[in-house]
């Protein structure tokens, strides 16, 4: 039965409310949380529909209110959600706006709701937000993004058995062991994206993940500090390296299944061992201007499609 909505010019049919609930929830999942909640005033069928949306995205800009703080908004809406499971939780806030214990509680609730995708984005000019160490343990999490001023402190091996995708974007690391403990606790990790700037608490970034298939490293270090990478990924098929000043400190120890490699925005390649490890690659893309090789590459051209 089609419902009708009256306005000053006549009668309009309410076709949207006749759509299947699953489709309506999919549409609502694409909207900011603030807009999703406002749909509750449309009509009676919409009154509680927003509580069933399985994705919650809280950005600072879209969740400001004169009556409630960011923390109060997140807590209220997270506890009001009645979806069978939580597909995605995105928390974006400014440093000092939320306490670590609050964020830990929200993520703990999401873990209890079997969340699959978690994004934590912290904006700061003062310091780094400490991601609660106890939250590196979740059976259902499939995708994790830690972005900007987040301190990664993993004193013991993590337990993220279902994690398939991990993005570490300009975060801090307390110790070298934090990287090892995090990655070693992801036995099914397939896609790893690492963005690094001048925050160089880790001198050698070791990536030893047997299940890894895709790896992207973007290093925006201006060259003042020396950073190193060691890659041990026997299942790796796709590799992208972007932004290095000089590829002298990237060692690929084990990547026999590598099919495609892309090297971009690199000033020069001065480490012959790097190309020696790429002999199994079917396609090598070099986006270097100007291209400067400190050695002959004649020994490798027969294996590569340039």
Curated annotation (Swiss-Prot):
PROSITE patterns linked: FBOX (PS50181)
InterPro entries: F-box-like_dom_sf, F-box_AtFBL13-like, F-box_dom, FBL13/AtMIF1-like, LRR_dom_sf, LRR_FXL15/At3g58940/PEG3-like
Organism listed in the record: Arabidopsis thaliana
Coiled coil: none
Presence of keyword rRNA-binding: no
Gene3D superfamilies membership: 1.20.1280.50, Ribonuclease Inhibitor (3.80.10.10)
Protein name: F-box/LRR-repeat protein At3g26922
Renumbered ranges of LRR repeats: 67-93, 98-122, 138-170, 171-196, 215-243, 263-288
Keywords linked to the UniProt accession: Leucine-rich repeat, Repeat
Matching Pfam families: F-box (PF00646), LRR_At5g56370 (PF24758)
Repeat keyword on record: yes
Source superkingdom: Eukaryota
Domain F-box: 13-73
């Amino acid at each position: 039965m089609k419902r009708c909505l009256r306005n000053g010019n006549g009668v309009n049919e309410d076709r949207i409310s006749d759509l299947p609930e699953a489709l309506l929830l999919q549409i609502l999942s694409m909207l900011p949380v603030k807009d999703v909640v406002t749909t509750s005033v449309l009509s009676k069928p919409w009154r509680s529909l927003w509580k069933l949306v399985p994705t919650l995205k809280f950005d600072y800009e879209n969740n400001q209110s004169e009556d409630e703080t960011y923390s109060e908004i997140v807590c209220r809406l997270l506890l009001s959600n009645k979806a069978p499971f939580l597909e995605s939780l995105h928390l974006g806030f400014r440093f000092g706006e939320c306490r670590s214990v609050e964020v830990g509680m929200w993520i703990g609730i999401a873990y209890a709701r079997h969340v699959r995708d978690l994004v934590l984005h912290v904006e700061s000019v003062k310091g780094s937000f400490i991601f609660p160490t106890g939250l590196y343990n979740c059976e259902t999490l499939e995708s994790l993004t830690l972005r900007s001023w987040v301190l990664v402190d993993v004193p013991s091996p993590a337990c993220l058995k279902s994690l398939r995708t991990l993005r570490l974007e300009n975060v801090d690391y307390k110790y070298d062991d934090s990287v090892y403990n995090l990655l070693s606790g992801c036995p099914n990790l397939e896609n790893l994206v690492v963005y690094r700037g001048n925050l160089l608490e880790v001198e050698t970034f070791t990536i030893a993940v047997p299940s890894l298939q895709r790896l992207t490293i973007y290093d925006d270090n201006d060259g003042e500090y020396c950073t190193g990478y060691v890659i041990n990924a026997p299942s790796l098929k796709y590799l992208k390296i972007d932004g290095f000043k000089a590829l002298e400190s990237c060692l690929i120890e084990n990547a026999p299944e590598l099919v495609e490699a892309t090297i971009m925005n690199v000033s020069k390649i001065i480490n012959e061992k790097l190309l020696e490890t790429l002999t199994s690659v079917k396609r090598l893309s070099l986006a270097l201007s100007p291209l400067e090789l400190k050695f002959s590459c004649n020994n490798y051209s027969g294996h590569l499609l340039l």
